[in-house]
Curated annotation (Swiss-Prot):
The keyword Transferase does not apply. NCBIfam families: rplS_bact. GO terms for biological process: translation. GO terms for cellular component: cytosolic large ribosomal subunit. This is Large ribosomal subunit protein bL19. Keywords: Ribonucleoprotein, Ribosomal protein. It comes from Colwellia psychrerythraea (strain 34H / ATCC BAA-681). This protein is located at the 30S-50S ribosomal subunit interface and may play a role in the structure and function of the aminoacyl-tRNA binding site. The gene is rplS. Belongs to the bacterial ribosomal protein bL19 family. Pfam families: Ribosomal_L19 (PF01245).
Length: 117
């Protein structure tokens, strides 16, 4: 029984996702349906948490909008998520960056991870 479930989940999982980690700045293109029209809306921010659970994987993105912190949790393999683009890699040493909620301004900045030679 579990093999059948695994096969069904494997079929529904997206394969074209980029590798990203907490601390990375990403742009998530989200499909928004208003009345009968559908459009893409960009949500750009820092990934503060990643939950890897196969088909049920999720990640949390945080951004500051008009001086107010906005966090949004996206299901990684959801059909609502159209695409994910990594803008810059962040150099952090923790898996969950919830401490960024308390910081503001320059203290909330994350160092950029430099490419290896």
């Amino acid at each position: 029984m579990s093999k059948i479930l695994e096969m069904l989940e494997q079929e529904q999982m997206k394969t074209d996702l980029p590798a990203f980690a907490p601390g990375d700045t990403v742009v998530v293109q989200v499909k928004v349906t208003e009345a009968d029209k559908s459009r893409l809306q960009a949500f750009e921010g820092v990934v503060i948490a990643v939950k890897s659970r196969g088909l049920h994987s999720a990640f949390t993105v945080r951004k500051i909008s008009n001086g107010v912190g906005v966090e949004r949790v996206f299901q990684t393999h959801s059909p609502i998520v159209d695409s994910i683009e990594v803008k810059r890699r962040g150099d952090v040493r923790q898996a969950k960056l919830y401490y960024l909620r308390e910081l503001s301004g320059r203290k909330a900045r994350i160092k950029e991870k430099l490419a290896k030679k």
